Every structure is written in C-alpha cells, then in structure tokens.
Amino acid sequence: MGVSIYYSATRNSLLTTTEKDSFNNLVNKLNQSFPYKNEAETLNFYEELSQGFILEGSTKLPLEDEAILMESIEYWLEALSQLTLSLSSADWIVNIEDSPASWVNDRWVMQWNQPKDRLDSYRVLA
C-alpha cells in the first residue's frame, strides 16, 4: 500500500484557456525539476473531475528511503505552493492521506505533532 499527496481546487468559474496553458507549463516545469522523477511519481492531475472541482490530482510518495520521502514531501508541498499562488482565485485543499496540510505564509506545510510517528506509520504501509 502506498502513501499519496492529494490536491484539489474549487472556484465558481472554470479555468480559462490561458490559465490552463500557464498552469500546465508550470506543472511540467515542476515535474521536470523533481530530483527523483525517474524513480517516483510526479504531479498527476486527473482528466475526469468530481462535481465542483476545477483541479484534482495525486502523487504517490516514495517510501523506500526516509530521506527521499522527506525530501519529496518538501518538494511537492513547495510545488503545490507555487501552483496555489498561480491560481490564487481558487480554494485549494492539500492532504497527505488523511492529514491536511495548512496554508501558512503563502506556502503549504504539514503540522504533525509527532512527525517520526507519522513516518513510521507510513513505513508500515509500504
């Protein structure tokens, strides 16, 4: 079983063609810059969306190595921060499994009380 980051956005209007193009260019840039892009998943936005969403997606995290896991979490939270800022008119939700990320000072952060315990529980799932 894996652990994933889930992300979604809602707003009252659909994305314009210009917004879609700009957003997709940023997604491609972020995916290409991910240091483990050949070994792990990158940003994956779903083509079929749930009602009311303008974006939905997920990225499976690499669980084999704790250092790579932590680096990946940091990278994807920063990447999602950039995407959130690029579509600031949308309401975003970011979770790692059932743990919500918090939007603090223009960036997504995880605020676990006991990060090592959380990592250990993810390792058990692998």
Regions found by a protein language model. Give the residues of each.
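Short, extreme N-terminal segment that most often corresponds to the first beta-strand
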Residues: 1-27
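N-terminal low-complexity, intrinsically disordered segments
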Residues: 21, 33-44
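Charged interaction segments
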Residues: 30, 41-126
